[in-house]
Structure formats: structure tokens, C-alpha cells
Regions:
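Residue-level recognition of conserved structural "scaffold" positions that shape functional pockets
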Residues: 10-11, 19, 47, 176
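Short intrinsically disordered, low-complexity coil segments enriched in acidic
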Residues: 1-3, 20, 148-150
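Short, low-complexity intrinsically disordered segments enriched in A/P/G/S/L with frequent Arg
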Residues: 3-16
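Intrinsically disordered, low-complexity regions enriched for glutamine and histidine
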Residues: 11, 28-29
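Bacterial N-terminal signal peptides
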Residues: 14-26
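PEST-like low-complexity, intrinsically disordered acidic/proline/serine-rich tracts
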Residues: 29-288
């Protein structure tokens, strides 16, 4: 793609060129801006970390977790016999819920709010659009793709801390090679933009980016591995289709916690789309 852009520039563009992607920021545009329809039922496919995800690990097993001294102290002091009913959902908070085996149901609560329900723990996440800085891409004078950010993130609202916290989301729209090529021609006076009005439409390439804060303290794993109220969770959801036509998404999750972690804790989790909700089995935190 890079060479093709350079060729187009050499063919007729004499001056430095910057083409900005117009990413709609109005709340009503968020649903229609989705790179694809991501609604429906999805099941987690556990292909790694089976012995930490499918069963409760033994006390003191914090393999692969970057706990600091305080985190290890709390994890080693975990006593399940002292857990209260109010603690039952600690392993189902936003910092860990996508790693819990089960199904998720994705719907739009409204044009600016994506809703994710889980059958494991009966949790509901609400991803709010229009709260994060706008991110886009442009083609520079060397025919290279550059990413840029405009504006600032809105602060989270005040209120009680919850298991799922406050999640702000945006679409990370990447350039479609064909769209970029058309954009270069348009800027050089050699053609028209994809929509005929100067707006570069990013096509079907892209992912979902989510930042979650305002979390109630919980567990990264069911054996008492802690995360605190200061935890910050960032997620990248990539939606894709395999060679046999099955739809998938992969969520890369990063948990940062200055109280209990010495470094970010990063995981990658796969989900496959199901045809309907016939296998949906809601299970409370206590019964899981």
C-alpha cells in the first residue's frame, strides 16, 4: 500500500499533501459508523490458559500476573471461607469478565451506547461513545499513512463505583487501501472522493477501542488475585471472519493498577459468533 501511494504522488502531486479522515463525532452517527454489524450472541473459545479460566486456580497461583509486593501479599492472604455474599461478583468485574468462559450478547442500547451482556455472572456493560478524543488518519506528502488525535477525553462522571465501571468507547477506523488511493487522486485533482463531497469514508477496516475506569475493587482471577479501585482497563476489539466464513472477535485487554500491579497485565481472548441465543444460559455470580 505504501508503494502504491508513493507512485500516485509521483504521478501528479507536486506539493506536500495532507488528507484528513472525517470521523463523525455526533452521537447519532456511532451505530452507523460501526465497521460491521457486531450485534448478536458470541461464545468464548478457550484455547489458552485453560487451567486458570475453566477452574478456580489454587491459592497463591499467580503465574503470568505482574503482581507487586502488595498484590502478592493480598493474593496469598485470600481465604474463600471469609468471602461474603456481596463479594460473589468480584471475579466478574470489567477487568476480568471477558476472560470468564461463557457467552456475551451485544446489542445497541441506543445510537450512542453499545451494550454487552454476559451469561456468566449476569453482568451488563455499557460502552459510551462520544466521550473519547477523536482519532483518525491522513496521507502525508510522502504517501505514508499517519495517525492523529483531536480533542481530549471527557472526564468520567462522578458516582458510585461498580463492577463494570464507566466505559468510554470509539471506533478505531483504519484506512482501506482502495479508499486511500481514491483520496490521493481526489486531493491531486485526478478524481473524486468516495462520497463525492470530500469526505474520506474508511470502509470496513477498523476496531473498537474501550477505556474503563470507576471500578469497584475485584479479582483478576477467581483465586483472589486483586485489582483495586484505581485500576484502568483498555480494550481493543478486532472483528474478523475465518476461512470457512465464521465470524469472530478478539479482545486484547490491558489492566493497569498502581496499587497491585508492577506492570500492565495483558491478555487476548477469542469469541466466535453463534446463530442465535438458544445456548444462552444466565448464571448468577454466586452459582457460577
Amino acid at each position: 500500500m505504501k508503494g502504491g501511494l508513493k507512485g500516485a504522488l509521483k504521478g501528479g502531486l507536486k506539493t506536500a499533501l495532507y488528507i484528513l479522515v472525517a470521523i463523525p463525532v455526533t452521537l447519532t452517527a456511532q451505530r452507523t459508523q460501526a465497521p460491521r454489524d457486531i450485534t448478536g450472541y458470541w461464545v468464548s473459545v478457550v484455547s489458552e490458559d485453560w487451567h486458570w479460566r475453566m477452574v478456580t486456580p489454587r491459592k497463591g497461583d499467580f503465574t503470568s500476573l505482574p503482581l507487586n509486593d502488595e498484590g502478592r501479599r493480598v493474593a496469598n492472604g485470600w481465604d474463600p471461607s471469609k468471602e461474603k455474599p456481596a463479594d460473589a461478583c468480584k471475579p466478574f468485574g470489567a477487568a476480568a469478565i471477558m476472560r470468564v468462559p461463557g457467552r456475551v450478547h451485544i446489542t445497541w442500547a441506543d445510537d450512542a451506547t453499545l451494550r454487552i451482556d454476559t451469561d456468566a455472572g449476569e453482568q451488563t456493560r455499557r460502552l459510551q461513545f462520544g466521550k473519547l478524543a477523536t482519532r483518525g488518519w491522513r496521507v502525508n506528502g510522502r504517501g505514508e499513512i499517519e495517525y492523529f488525535q483531536q480533542g481530549t477525553d471527557a472526564p468520567p462522571p462522578s458516582g458510585p463505583l461498580t463492577w463494570q465501571g464507566y466505559s468510554a468507547a470509539r471506533w478505531e477506523l483504519a484506512p482501506d487501501p482502495k479508499t486511500v488511493r481514491n483520496a490521493v487522486f481526489f486531493a491531486g485533482g485526478l478524481g473524486t472522493s468516495p462520497d463525492g463531497a470530500g469526505t474520506i469514508v474508511p470502509g470496513t477496516f477498523g476496531s473498537l477501542y474501550v477505556v474503563t475506569t470507576q471500578l469497584r475493587a475485584g479479582y483478576l482471577r477467581a483465586n483472589g488475585i486483586p485489582y483495586s479501585e484505581a485500576a484502568r482497563v483498555t480494550e481493543d476489539y478486532d472483528f474478523w471472519t475465518d476461512d470457512v466464513g465464521a465470524e469472530w472477535f478478539t479482545v486484547s485487554t490491558t489492566v493497569e493498577d498502581p496499587k497491585y500491579l508492577s506492570a500492565p497485565f495483558v491478555t487476548s481472548t477469542d469469541f466466535r459468533k453463534e446463530p442465535d441465543g438458544s445456548k444462552w444460559r444466565p448464571t448468577t455470580c454466586a452459582a457460577y
